[in-house]
Amino acid sequence: MNMLLTMLTNITLSTLLISIAFWLPQLNIYTEKANPYECGFDPMSSARLPFSMKFFLVAITFLLFDLEIALLLPIPWAIQVKDINTMTLTAFILVSILALGLAYEWTQKGLEWTE
């Protein structure tokens, strides 16, 4: 019962804060705030450079595999548990899912820099 009350309070508070942020936007919108600042001078060129979508996809793939390493690092300490089969199966499933994702990216040519 205590956990249910805590969850209900958290959901209510989150919904209330999101509603307030949505329904009470900032009324004073200044166009100067959207411009880049260069020591008080007008910028020489556009500050918003085009972003390579290929770089973004490779960066996201790198972050996924970096997360995999972070999730697999505790495995040597988990070997001390009594049920090692569950730990091994979980690690194998995690590596398999990420390997399938990498194979999919490779076949869809998502890791190619040139087109």
Curated annotation (Swiss-Prot):
One of its GO terms (biological process) is mitochondrial electron transport, NADH to ubiquinone. Pfam families: Oxidored_q4 (PF00507). One of its GO terms (cellular component) is NADH dehydrogenase complex. It is an enzyme of class 7 (translocase). Its EC number is 7.1.1.2. It catalyses: a ubiquinone + NADH + 5 H(+)(in) = a ubiquinol + NAD(+) + 4 H(+)(out). It is found in: Mitochondrion inner membrane. Keywords: Electron transport, Membrane, Mitochondrion, Mitochondrion inner membrane, NAD, Respiratory chain, Translocase, Transmembrane, Transmembrane helix, Transport, Ubiquinone. The keyword Membrane applies. Core subunit of respiratory chain NADH dehydrogenase (Complex I) which is composed of 45 different subunits. Interacts with TMEM186. Interacts with TMEM242. PANTHER family: NADH-UBIQUINONE OXIDOREDUCTASE CHAIN 3 (PTHR11058:SF9). This is NADH-ubiquinone oxidoreductase chain 3. It comes from Neotoma lepida (Desert woodrat). The gene is MT-ND3.
